[in-house]
Amino acid sequence: MDATGELDTVEFINIAKDDVFMNPSHKYPAPIEREMVTIVKPFVQKSLEVNQTILDIFNDKLGLPEGTLLEQHPLHEHSGSEARIIKNPPMPHDAHKRAIGAHTDFGSLVSFLE
């Protein structure tokens, strides 16, 4: 709810990469738990493959020794990486009203898929 009392329309769920590939430390809603292996894990795996390709390109363009950036992102070690799913229903256009306000993303890479 904002200062005027208007309710939020945006829903978020964050799924930790560690929970996808290792023992989950969080309990997720039933639909996520049910589809963790068939939908969530393949999605996260493909996203990581895309990010690894981008890191390889950056690594090459920066003239770093091969694998330098990937070494900073080991797959099976604790990480702060997560998949975030955002649900926001269509709204009438209002240039002064945004569903997701200004914010800072964290980490090495952020992939946005719509």
Question: PLM features: residue spans?
Answer:
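Peripheral, non-catalytic segments flanking oxidoreductase cores
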Residues: M1-E114
